[in-house]
Amino acid sequence: MQHYGVNGYSLHAMNSLSAMYNLHQQAAQQAQHAPDYRPSVHALTLAERLAGCTFQDIILEARYGSQHRKQRRSRTAFTAQQLEALEKTFQKTHYPDVVMRERLAMCTNLPEARVQVWFKNRRAKFRKKQRSLQKEQLQKQKEAEGSHGEGKAEAPTPDTQLDTEQPPRLPGSDPPAELHLSLSEQSASESAPEDQPDREEDPRAGAEDPKAEKSPGADSKGLGCKRGSPKADSPGSLTITPVAPGGGLLGPSHSYSSSPLSLFRLQEQFRQHMAATNNLVHYSSFEVGGPAPAAAAAAAAVPYLGVNMAPLGSLHCQSYYQSLSAAAAAHQGVWGSPLLPAPPAGLAPASATLNSKTTSIENLRLRAKQHAASLGLDTLPN
């Protein structure tokens, strides 16, 4: 005897098709009174189950069993208690085993297949929720990065404004050097008018060198150029600067007086002084020695060699200047002969003739080279 299980019920209780037909008629009459009543599938009785089927389906089911057609199962409606039990179990584990599913089915009065399918759907729902959360987090991170990027893009704008404001300040760093040069030029231009009274008192100076008739502005420019480039002090340029004993020494000493005394500047002053004395040395060999005021004039001219320079023996570089003074004494007795003041007006023609013979450019260049070679200044740094 075959038993065909339909939702927990067997068909062996039905003995004939007539009995089944009678049940069907009764169920149809009951369904007409309450057509909107659709209880849960598990709560349906056999009469209610048969009420939804046609007579042909009942005959086919009785003859061939329930496997002759594809069964259409209605959607299971879970109660609140069933859902609560299922959710608690899902919080414990997402993959319950068979034993856990059987117990849960007994507790919730649900078939084990429904429990298994519910867990499968619940896992799919959980994965979908996780993906949506990840997408939201990524979107928030992108928005945060975009806001940070905009903040960084906005932050450099004040920096660029500062950079645009800074270039005008860069030329402002040059004024100290420009001020220094302008001060040196101003001091040279101030020293140039001081030279002019000496030139006016010395009528022989105008007859000595025709190049001495340059304007004070030209002298100041020459001094500025000489201070800017030390290499410009060639023997040819040395012949232009010294004109008078006081005049040739005032310009460089005045411009150097604002800065500390250094070895390089002392060398420059020494070269200028020696170039100035080259034009004056030959006077001591041809003319009578200066009177008593000559020593006073030499003493008055000495402070212009530097910042109130002491005698060579009392300087810090004593050995260096002793060697220089020895070489200078060996060469024409430069330091021994005093700097001569302006001679009387009667000796001007004779001195002019001597000057025209001895102060030519070639002789002066030769004298400067010989003097530099004797002092060993060619090996010194320029």
Curated annotation (Swiss-Prot):
Cell compartment(s), UniProt: Nucleus
BP GO terms, sorted: adult feeding behavior; adult locomotory behavior; brain development; central nervous system development; developmental growth; negative regulation of DNA-templated transcription; regulation of transcription by RNA polymerase II
SUPFAM superfamilies in the record: Homeodomain-like
UniProt feature, compositional bias: Low complexity: 178-191
UniProtKB keywords: Developmental protein, DNA-binding, Homeobox, Nucleus, Repressor, Transcription, Transcription regulation
Major location category of this protein: nucleus
GO molecular function terms attached to this record: DNA binding; DNA-binding transcription factor activity; DNA-binding transcription factor activity, RNA polymerase II-specific; DNA-binding transcription repressor activity, RNA polymerase II-specific; identical protein binding; RNA polymerase II transcription regulatory region sequence-specific DNA binding; sequence-specific DNA binding; sequence-specific double-stranded DNA binding
DNA-binding feature ranges: 71-130
UniProt region (Interaction with OTX2 and is required for repressor activity), positions on chain: 1-156
Family in the record: Belongs to the paired homeobox family.
The protein's name in its UniProt record: Diencephalon/mesencephalon homeobox protein 1
Organism expressing this protein natively: Homo sapiens
